[in-house]
Amino acid sequence: MLSEPVELYYISDDRLVATTQSIVSPATISQVLAALIAGPPTGNNGLGLRSALPTVLNAEIDISKGVAQINTTAEFLTELSPIDQRLAIAQLVLTFTRRPGVGQVIFTVDDQNVAVPRGRGDLAKPGSTVSFDDYSSLIVALAG
């Protein structure tokens, strides 16, 4: 069984850290999402890391023309503090824009466009895309 390295982003002191995990190849978007939701790696690579994502995340992800549309339920945004909301969005955007064929992400809640916080704290307008660069200011370092 072949596996491939996948970059997943987790939180350390309100900053994001890239970790690499092996996922069965070819890694699908749903496999990447499941790995991200499962939480940081065990052992030294995951030491001090956490996830802002809920352990149960109802999300559908469709990729078209380089844009990943992540459609979730209202609970995804309402159950998180404002800081964790920004970090959870950053985890998703940074992780998925590292995948081949994805350059931007757009968020919807119950199929309606929503504003999401960017890394600097400002809001991306409903229906506008966000990218890796919108959250790169939150990245602290590369972990193994």
Listing of model-derived features with the role each one plays in the protein:
Residues 1-144:
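Bimodal "functional hotspot" detector
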